[in-house]
Amino acid sequence: VIKASILCLALAIYHESRGESENGQYAVAEVVVNRSIERNKTICDVIYEPRQFSGSNKWKIPKDNNQWKQSINIATNVLDNEVKTNYTNGSMYFRVASLSPKNKQIIRIGNHVFYK
């Protein structure tokens, strides 16, 4: 049985960053965790906030087993504090690089720009 927080975070990692590097996937997880801490909300509450993560109200458990397993592993590592990362320097948001405001950019990882 997978804990709800791990499932929600894994869904975000999968749907927002599959195809990105492992660092990019950890960075997406960091943003979710940063928001959870800052807003004193659960991981699932953060994921399902209106207009925050594209299509999150329609996300389903993926059929791509390898990418899904990696998403579960990353979510588990992050939430169980097995792996501590700080790729985003405390970023609260990310966007596709082509749509991101240049003046707020903290770091670019793959196709995403992370900012506060």
Task: State each model region's role.
Residues 5-116:
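Bacterial extracytoplasmic/cell-wall-associated proteins, especially those involved in peptidoglycan
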